[in-house]
């Protein structure tokens, strides 16, 4: 009994590592943030939309991570032999089946509910496939990954007639920067991707801060002098400072460990970007659930890798 329980626990752990569980949680924050930002009067009865929305984001992210490791099987055998598929803890065929089911079921949940966001979910699923199977190792790889996360954010925004593409574009740009940096996290030894990646991230954060202060992004009675605006922009500034601090260490010592730390910080910072935006537009109380999401993702990331 003990041996069987132990094997079962190790199998579950392998699957949680495969899907990058901390990142799955940050994916839920993307779409939920989009919904909350443009629906400031949301109430508990909106859970019939919020729960499927979060579920779709998490399913598509998990499916994408599984497909990532299926596609990179040969590379991981040489560079990351301890990962679930090359180590034999998860069968490649099982991971491929899981990815295929997730990429169909995810958009299907919103389509079943006749939500307009289902069209965006389908586009996101297609983008996930294109990134993992064709674009990842090309010059378009970072742009494709940024598009995936931008679409995930846009999926929540689409529930409002006020939605625009500016916020998801700027958010996706930040992910482009993370992805640029991640390309050197295995080999290390070069700052060729780190510096441009950090510059892209800073440009994205500046754009997000500016968009949060624009008239179209806030309720009619919002005033830029309000405390919530200062606090929200300060949170975005803190994200920038944290990235630059970790980035400086990676520049000084461009080893795999320091670069992986920079990438991990960037991934977990995605939730804080949402916290900053929601705080600036709607106030701190509306952002508290997203702080809780970050705490959960951070605690899990101490045990499971997020990149």
Predicted regions and their residues:
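Multi-pass membrane catalytic core of lipid/isoprenoid biosynthesis enzymes
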Residues: 52-57, 73-128, 146, 150-156, ...
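C-terminal membrane-associated helical module and adjoining short loops/tails
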Residues: 2-16, 150-307
